[in-house]
């Protein structure tokens, strides 16, 4: 999972203006970096230009996903990431950056601004912090921990069963479980298998 670009733009009536951008092109060869960066700027501007105000969208291009958020006040943000990067985290980042940007940069500067004239140093920090969505987004971190716990539980249960042995056989042979518990297990098993087929 990787973020390559984080841009803040202004969607004007005549054209889209790049206000500030941060890039991570370290995974590209040295000679490709400036071209890749220019292409990401071009793509970001094009996506904002073709998006309506008040919309969020994700555009797939080969192995990359471009997430765009254009607010009703014409402020827009674009994240370019690989296709494994979670969309929810990308949109959380865009919302956070645009809220912060609108508080720190005067609205009068948006239509006439440029990366050289706009002072918003936090963008590079956001790009590097959100490289790992688990660390940046608490929900993603919790979900990953739950997934890991599920995997551990499944591995543990499978490792307890001997080769060729099934949990159903163990339940039916069990002397510890009462008749009612065995009936409950069988009913639950049938319901779960019924739902899995649907």
Swiss-Prot record:
The keyword Transmembrane helix does not apply. Palmitoylated; catalyzes its own palmitoylation. Palmitoylation is required for Golgi targeting. Farnesylation is required for Golgi targeting. One of its GO terms (cellular component) is Golgi apparatus. SMART domains: Longin. Vesicular soluble NSF attachment protein receptor (v-SNARE) mediating vesicle docking and fusion to a specific acceptor cellular compartment. Functions in endoplasmic reticulum to Golgi transport; as part of a SNARE complex composed of GOSR1, GOSR2 and STX5. Functions in early/recycling endosome to TGN transport; as part of a SNARE complex composed of BET1L, GOSR1 and STX5. Has a S-palmitoyl transferase activity. The longin domain regulates palmitoylation and membrane targeting. This is Synaptobrevin homolog YKT6.
